[in-house]
Amino acid sequence: MHLEAVSTRANVTALKNPNWNQNLFLMLLFGLTATRAWAAVPSANSVKLVTQHGYLPDLPVLVRVEVLTPQGTRDWSLWDGEAVLSVDSGAVTLSTNRIPMRNGMGSTLVSFSGGGDLNLTATVGALHATRPLASLAGSPITTVGGTSAVDAIWSGVVRVTNDFTIPAAFTLTIQPNTLVLLDGVNSGTAGVDINVNGRIDVQGTESDPVTFTCSSTNSNVRWGQLRHSSASLATAPVSTYRWAAITRAGRAPGEGHTGQAPVVRSSAARVRFEHCSITDHGVTTPGAAGFGTPGKIGYATGSDLSFDDCLFQRARMGPEVDGTALLFTNGVIMDMRGPDDGDGMYIHAQSAGQTCALKLSVIAAGDDDGLDTLDPVVTVEDCILRDWASVVEDAKAISVFNGVTTVRRCLIVDSTVGISAKTSGSNTTVRVNIHESTITRNRTNVLAQFKSNATGPRIDYRITNSILWGVADSVASDFGETNFTIGFCNISEPWPGTGNIVSDPMFVSAANHDFRLLAFSPSIDSGNPQSTADADGSPIDQGWITFLPGPSALSHPQQMPDGSHRFDLSGYTNRQYVIEYSTNALDWLYLFTSFQTNDPSLMVDPEARNSPMRLYRARLAP
């Protein structure tokens, strides 16, 4: 007779409880104990609430809410949600108490009337987070403007009454918990600007962020822009914005795509944004006065930009970059609205030696293209692109116009067209590489599109290890099938190519936007066998997310006459499992790795001889 135990973190803890002494004794007595596969008992998700530490009555404040997994990443499985705001002061009234959320992220502008210190709480389902906000009414205000002839340091409440310029070789430092109020106008292009010809260092923190916003409580009044420029990119200093909210700008001259004003204008400059929110620079309600004006997120020429953990929301369009290196990681772009060109991002050709990449990000909900391109070489990895569904604007999640775009491990859904590619003439080409991605629930998943003077053979799609599912015409061309080379894909229509299948991919719940694969989906292990294997040693799957089987189980323990131990491992086939052992249920050591070819498989531990107690557990590699 042998005792079986489940080795979870909770039960290992229980073994140290005095009430379990008898069971521990039985383990010692009987020796071999088989265990199920273990997994750390996860903590619950959590809510992160980011907003400025102090506020002025009736002046809108950006409130950003995120739902985080126990690993600290945004919970993308929270496809659509809502955060509810509340305060603990009966003397304070909120302009709104609801924040729509997508994939674990949402924000809105909230004004607090009545005054007084308060605690602001954001609740998402059963989760909540609270932050104190102190009233800044009556606080001293520093007034600035003009050109600074020295390094400048801002703190507290700062009001910029006319254009402020920091010259070359000088630095503007903005300390944590600074509220920067810029004077604005209700029409035209004469809002107050900050011109950075030298360097800016915004030193916000999560608990004490920096805010740039308009000094007026009138929502139609907006300031101008943040303008970065230098003599050359090679000698440009690096400007940094950390934990900054930049809201209610755009009264500046229009430039580039859409002709609207860029809130961040960069020319031959190096600018880094970390944990920033650039929001509320345009009218995004259809039919409202000024719809689609006056601001877009940014416009850069000849520059080097990076954005990490940044939110762009509620503007005419996201950033437009030309001849510029761009890295956008762990970010969210939402709600780019307006008549024509309400794009999430627009990337032109970069300069020699520069790269453009978007990674680990969500690009959701706009009136035109999630990502629009003109001639660049760009990589999109580990992203969700969703809800670019306007029929009027011929919307696409990704629009590729010349150049090379590579899409890897992405989910592209609920758009008019998933990916469209076109060229401008007989002397231009376009290449689209799609690997390990899921493109589904779009009117058309991939399209080779006609453009004036274009010829079909110059559009070249290479698609592997992907799922293109959900519409009768999943792969469409204005020219012919020769635009597409497709292999080892699951497509909702027959298509020539090695390894292609037409079979329901068995999503967990497409209706609820859960596009993971169910066990025994035909897309599991069905990718190109020459591709790099998945981390657990199995052949690569088709689609954007690797299938993870359920817990394995160890059973039927036996102690053989020679003292060795045997037991069965039951787990998903074609996967590597790591077996570990312990003599005290607390300290675990590696024993061996086994490739599961049959279910169950016999495991043998020849080193177990003369062990007073031996516990085992198994997990999926690596």
Please place each PLM-identified region on the residue numbering.
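Extracellular beta-helix/beta-solenoid repeat scaffolds
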Residues: S155-G224
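Residue-level detector of buried hydrophobic side-chain packing
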Residues: I174, F212, A244, C489, ...
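Short, composition-biased motifs enriched in small/polar/acidic residues
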Residues: P549-P622
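Surface-exposed loop/turn motifs in large extracellular/passenger domains
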Residues: P167-T173, N197-P209, H228-W243, V263-H275, ...
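Short glycine/acidic-rich loop motifs that flank beta-strands on beta-rich extracellular proteins
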Residues: T161-T165, D183-G191, S215-T217, V221-G224, ...
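Core sequence-specific DNA-binding domains of diverse transcription factors
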Residues: A40-G138
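Predominantly extracellular beta-rich ligand-binding scaffolds that present long acidic/polar faces
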Residues: I141, D382-D387, A397-D514
